[in-house]
Amino acid sequence: GEAPLDNAGKLVSALPETSNLIVDPLDVLESQEPPSRFRSFMNDLQNHVVNTGSLGILHCLEGRSVPPLRDTTEHFADVVFHLQTNIKGDEVENKLAIPKFRGGRAPSDIIKLDLVERVSIDTSRDIA
C-alpha cells in the first residue's frame, strides 16, 4: 500500500474550496520517517487550507506514547486546545486549556466544561 503521508497528501490536494478537513487521529502521520516528510506534509496542508479558505482540525491523542513530532504539529497549528479529563469515583471533570492562539489572545484561565448531552461552560471563577 501507499505510505500514509503520500495518501494523506493526495487527499489534502483534492480538497475543494471551503472544505472542513478532520484528521483523527494525526498520530500515524506524526510517526512517519524521516521527520522532514511530515514537515513537508504540514506545510502543504497549511498552504492548501489557507488557499482554499478551508478549515483543518488535527486530533492529537496524548497517552502512553506521544509521537516524536507532536511539537512540530503544535508549531504549525494556529490554535491548540488541550482537553484534560479527570475521573474521581463516579464523577468526570473536563478542563480545557488554550495554550496557543495565533493572531488572537488565548485565555489565561483553564475553562471547566460540562460535557453531557450538550457542552456548557462553567463561568464561575473556580476554573483553575
Please give the residue ranges for each predicted region:
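Short, Asp-centered acidic motifs that coordinate Mg2+ and/or phosphate
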Residues: 20, 55, 79
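Phosphate-binding/switch region of NTP-binding enzymes
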Residues: 60-120
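Hydrophobic, well-ordered secondary-structure segments
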Residues: 8, 23, 39-42, 74
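Conserved catalytic network of the ASCE P-loop NTPase/AAA+ motor domain
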Residues: 12-16, 47-52, 72-75
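Conserved inter-motif catalytic segment of the P-loop NTP-binding fold
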Residues: 1-35
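Conserved beta-strand segments of the P-loop GTPase G domain that flank and frequently precede/overlap
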Residues: 24, 29-31, 57-61, 83-84
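Substrate-engagement module of ASCE P-loop NTPases
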Residues: 33, 37-63
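NTP-binding/hydrolysis catalytic cores, primarily Walker-type P-loop NTPases
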Residues: 8-16, 113-128
